[in-house]
Curated annotation (Swiss-Prot):
The lineage of its organism: Bacteria, Bacillati, Cyanobacteriota, Cyanophyceae, Oscillatoriophycideae. This is ATP phosphoribosyltransferase regulatory subunit. CDD domains: HisRS-like_core (cd00773). InterPro entries: aa-tRNA-synth_II/BPL/LPL (IPR045864), HisRS-like_core (IPR041715), HisRS/HisZ (IPR004516), HisZ (IPR004517). Signal peptide: none annotated. It comes from Picosynechococcus sp. (strain ATCC 27264 / PCC 7002 / PR-6).
Amino acid sequence: MIHQPPAGARDLLPLEVAQKAWINDNLQRVFQQWGYQRIVTSTLEWLETLTAGGAVDRTKVIQLQTAESQALGLRPELTASIARAAVTRMAENTFPQRLCYRANVFRHPPRGSHGKQMEFYQAGVELLFAAGIVADAEILLLLADSLDALGLEDWQLILGEAALGRSLLDPFPEPVRETVRHCVANLDRVGLQELPLDEDLKAYALDIFDLRGEPETILARVSQFDLGPEAQEIVANLKALFALLAGSTQKQLPIILDLTLIQTFDYYTGIVFEVVNFANHQSYILGQGGRYDQLLGLYHPQRENHPGIGFCLNIEELHTCLLTSPQLPKQLAGSAWLVIATEPNAQQQVFHYAQTLRQGDEMVRVEVELGGRSPAEIYAYARSSHITHLAWIDPSGEPKLETL
């Protein structure tokens, strides 16, 4: 088995690495334009850190043990680790912290999914110590700017509100509340209709089920519900957020308001969202995020809560959707120069000349011919590798230059 990676792992070959680096580099450039600074957290964390007080299912965490039998895990996402670092290492700075990252994450696949991928690559941002709709708007506008920088089209932002979604389920008896939540989140209308509910609650459940669509329409409908003061305030804030977004960009964000949206990780307290792209007759979740105003308090030494909001973008899905894009590199960048010794005793001069070329332009790629190939083989290699210049070096160090 040593000739293969383990089930769930995969190698990335140079062209795929170059393409994903192009995606990452463009995203990081946009993040930095918005004032975000890169942070790097540990791949290994205490298991308690990664589960975020139970908000992250520990069965999704790939676990390890120290020699002292202490439980560690490979991070299944970055937000918990960044929250921990922010409140323990940057606690003196309670003004807004703009942090970004590019990293790998690890997750156990669902049971019965042997061989499914366990390592994933993400890029994202976290805006910490910042509450309110202005911070929410910044994150959503940054997300749109990031996707535009990649030349992505046909994407939609599916946006919900975690606290409002939970409050809409309050009228249901506790024994069936989670089942209703599951049916609504998974678009299971038949399952919802078969639940043992009285007619009024069943009609209410179906009303909730249909709370997806154009933001203004959905907010008008939910405003007709018998909402408590907190839910009414959330609806008012959503209206203000959409008005702010509409007036802040020339290109309107393609938003679908879905008040039944539920995220994988259960630490969200405010807006939650997914970015979905439609390509090759399939839908891809390009990213997800939301507001988490109680997560930082789990790691703060004095348990002080601080607000936060962020998103992550899934590099594999972005790569898949961009494969037909003319912007994505379709071949590896070839070396500009191949330096060849005309005789075996000219090898020292070859290394000297190659280094002179590199020092003249730090961006130039220069290869040295290692010997053993005929001139015909050298020319064939240079053409197949998109090398544009050859330098034939004799024992005196004199170059003979060719352009292909």
